């Protein structure tokens, strides 16, 4: 991948997502960074699985959200900027109630903070 410069906008949670859906405000935020000179933008964490039901995290698993992701990518790409998706799973970490109903991880050992055992 070739970039127009070395400016990369790091991932950060904007909370511009509504009920796990990409919004116009989120798209405008990232497009503005591309117009301002960013050659690559790393998205905020994207929910990969249905058990990651955080209203402020864009849901990759939801087919109804595909149009929003497409509009988001097209808006950034139209400014000669690359949008890199940061997929996230909380893994075995499970410190907050409701944060990760089913802990997932490669180890059968419990999380050292919450003692949640991953599956």
Residue ranges and their predicted role:
Residues 1-119:
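Flavin-dependent oxidoreductase catalytic cores
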């Amino acid at each position: 991948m070739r970039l127009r410069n070395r400016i990369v906008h790091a991932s950060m949670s904007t909370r511009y997502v509504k009920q796990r859906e990409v919004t116009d405000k989120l798209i405008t935020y990232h497009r503005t960074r591309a117009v301002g000179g960013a050659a690559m933008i790393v998205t905020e964490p994207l929910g990969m699985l249905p058990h990651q039901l955080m209203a402020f995290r864009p849901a990759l698993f939801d087919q109804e959200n595909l149009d929003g992701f497409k509009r988001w990518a097209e808006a950034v790409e139209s400014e000669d900027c690359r949008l890199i998706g940061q997929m996230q799973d909380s893994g075995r970490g499970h410190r907050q109630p409701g944060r990760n109903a089913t802990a997932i991880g490669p180890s059968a050992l419990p999380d050292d903070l919450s003692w949640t055992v991953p599956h």
